[in-house]
Amino acid sequence: MEREPGAAGVRRALGRRLEAVLASRSEANAVFDILAVLQSEDQEEIQEAVRTCSRLFGALLERGELFVGQLPSEEMVMTGSQGATRKYKVWMRHRYHSCCNRLGELLGHPSFQVKELALSALLKFVQLEGAHPLEKSKWEGNYLFPRELFKLVVGGLLSPEEDQSLLLSQFREYLDYDDTRYHTMQAAVDAVARVTGQHPEVPPAFWNNAFTLLSAVSLPRREPTVSSFYVKRAELWDTWKVAHLKEHRRVFQAMWLSFLKHKLPLSLYKKVLLIVHDAILPQLAQPTLMIDFLTRACDLGGALSLLALNGLFILIHKHNLEYPDFYRKLYGLLDPSVFHVKYRARFFHLADLFLSSSHLPAYLVAAFAKRLARLALTAPPEALLMVLPFICNLLRRHPACRVLVHRPHGPELDADPYDPGEEDPAQSRALESSLWELQALQRHYHPEVSKAASVINQALSMPEVSIAPLLELTAYEIFERDLKKKGPEPVPLEFIPAQGLLGRPGELCAQHFTLS
């Protein structure tokens, strides 16, 4: 294609080719010149070619000049005896197919401007293909959507090679439409299956792209809201699955389960677990199917175990899931490091939630109170100011455990029946012991810790103490608070005012020293 140098020259040359193709079928071969520019290495030329292709094939779709139905082989049609119009439409449909494939490749272009334009053009074709289907309707009211083209789009977004988070942020706005969201979920299932099947070791970039897309999907809360379609429809048929929230939830579930059944990077486990309780579980058709993922995450230890327990707790209390090892897992997370990790506040917030039921057996609550009290002996002051009210709250909720602080004839310290090495709280014999650790902490060097530990010396008040303000307390905050404390009035040390540097005449100091 002859063209003037520079982007402006390319624009004018492409414009002439576009006008020629749209004006006369005899100029159809000019499409090759337009498609050739899509292969250019110049970023600005590619952008002009994408815009031209968008206008060209958008117009052809609207005018019905592309073949409709199962696309036959180009060679077979061109050498056959079909009419010129049919040959033209089949030939142009093949060119349209080549254009879409190239636009799909451009979703991985180094330039974000090129990727953004390619995405915009492909989604325009999706909308136009939906309005002017390239497949024949099998019956009246048959729901048609350009699924293969849309799979191409989603496949480009879920690239195994590069981070597509910026492009995915542009795509998020299309997830507000019910039909594109529904087909995005279906296409994501296919993309995960394809990539995991092709790569023995799936690149981290793919997992990150997939999570970015999946976490952006949010379902409507009520059935009547499923009516906003990207591909405009004259009417909605009740037989369409895409029009029912129940089907959306089923596909949403399939999408997440297909993703979570694979071994993910640890960083992704944490990201998923942070949103599982409010963004995933409430929207699943069968939330209990998440049990495999949550138990697998629970075995990873540390913060991941804690976050997984949060999801399991929801399944137990809201969906009647039976998980006998729940409190045993939580008990196993209590070790000296729990006071020093960055997720300490979240841990104790969730632990307080898990132990909030007054129907828990006394032996179980006693085991947690005793384990925390034992760990408190080596905990820093900022942690003690939170964990001591935590223990007292457990005693308030469960009066049967108050025997731990009222056992006057209990065993000596060297005969404490509590077994700190026992992993099962039911076998720890905590209820036979006492919280002597709290009495020991009454002699702590920090006065606020000593005061907090002394609460057990009186009858515990029934209203619980809120630990929320204490969860994120730091040593720096305690230090600053101590510095700002106002001390008592100055203590008088001598009732007779001093006179002079050596005191009053006649005093011992004045008798033996002189200032002369």
From Swiss-Prot:
Subcellular location as annotated: Nucleus membrane; Nucleus, Nucleolus
Keyword Membrane: yes
GO cellular component: Noc4p-Nop14p complex; nuclear membrane; nucleolus; nucleoplasm; small-subunit processome
Protein origin, superkingdom: Eukaryota
Pfam families given in the database record: CBF
Keywords from the named record: Membrane, Nucleus, Transmembrane, Transmembrane helix
GO BP annotations listed: rRNA processing
Membrane topology category: Multi-pass membrane protein
Gene Ontology molecular function: RNA binding
Membrane-crossing residue ranges in chain numbering: 297-317, 347-367, 375-395
Keyword NADP: no
SUPFAM superfamilies cross-referenced by the UniProt entry: ARM repeat
InterPro entries according to UniProt: ARM-type_fold (IPR016024), CCAAT-binding_factor (IPR005612), Noc4 (IPR027193)
UniProt record similarity statement: Belongs to the CBF/MAK21 family.
UniProt name for this protein: Nucleolar complex protein 4 homolog
Originating species: Homo sapiens (Human)
